[in-house]
């Protein structure tokens, strides 16, 4: 009957409106979180990093005393020149904690850049592992996958890690798509695990296989070549100067 048709029409319309509203909310929520994450990081960079006038250094100083008053989980600062990778590094007893939390403790799907809970916070381990989300906007470690291109590496062969004690140059050794249980995810990886990464690296490093005394940093983010794929970039730490 006409009444049944009309009722069906309104029921379908209500469902479509519900779907539209939910989708709209999801889109709004996504971009709202992106903007909140970007704004907060810009504020952190503005408030706690110091570039001295007239200095030609590529890197900068970080006011760790003030930054740690905001959050005592801050262990370091990671910086890739000519890139959005310019973030404090946090560490918590639970690796899941900063997957969805910002430095101020607020919930955000962008999360934070964070160090593996197993690592010593002063980079004294053989291999320090640092994680970040692969955001489609390029935030966090979204741009780390640029190292899948050798030409990008040729223009960006090093990063900087600032800590409360020492500033380091991070000379990049290899980048590879790996399984989440790859033996490289160890605070003391074997020489064979490192050699395997170098053999399949997405860029041609200028470095030789490092000796046992070298300290390494592994940067890790999601990749999409297969289920649970990860993309890692490994570098060798070189101390530049004491910061205390």
Residue ranges and their predicted role:
Residues 17-244:
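Solvent-exposed, non-transmembrane regions of membrane-associated and secreted proteins
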Residues 1-5:
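Short, small-residue-biased leader/transition segments that mark boundaries at the very start
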Residues 7-18:
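Alpha-helical transmembrane segments
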């Amino acid at each position: 009957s006409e009444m049944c048709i009309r009722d069906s029409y309104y029921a379908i319309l209500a469902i479509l409106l519900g779907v539209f509203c939910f989708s709209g909310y999801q889109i709004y929520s996504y971009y709202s979180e992106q903007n909140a994450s970007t704004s907060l990081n810009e504020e952190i960079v503005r408030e706690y990093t110091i570039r001295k006038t007239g200095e030609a250094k590529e890197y900068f100083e970080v006011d760790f005393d003030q930054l740690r008053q905001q959050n005592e989980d801050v262990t370091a600062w990671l910086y890739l020149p000519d890139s959005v990778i310019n973030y404090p590094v946090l560490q918590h007893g639970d690796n899941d904690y900063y997957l969805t939390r910002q430095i101020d403790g607020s919930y955000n799907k962008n999360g934070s850049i964070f160090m593996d809970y197993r690592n010593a916070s002063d980079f004294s381990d053989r291999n320090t592992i640092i994680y970040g989300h692969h955001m489609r906007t390029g935030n966090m470690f979204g741009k780390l996958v640029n190292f899948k291109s050798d030409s990008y590496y040729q223009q960006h062969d090093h990063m900087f890690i600032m800590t409360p004690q020492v500033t380091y140059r991070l000379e990049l050794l290899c980048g590879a798509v790996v399984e989440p249980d790859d033996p490289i995810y160890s605070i003391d990886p074997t020489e064979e695990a490192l050699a395997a990464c170098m053999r399949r690296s997405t860029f041609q490093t200028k470095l030789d296989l490092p000796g046992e005394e070298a300290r390494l940093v592994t940067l890790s983010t999601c990749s999409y070549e297969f289920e649970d794929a990860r993309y890692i970039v490994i570098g060798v730490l070189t101390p530049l100067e004491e910061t205390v």
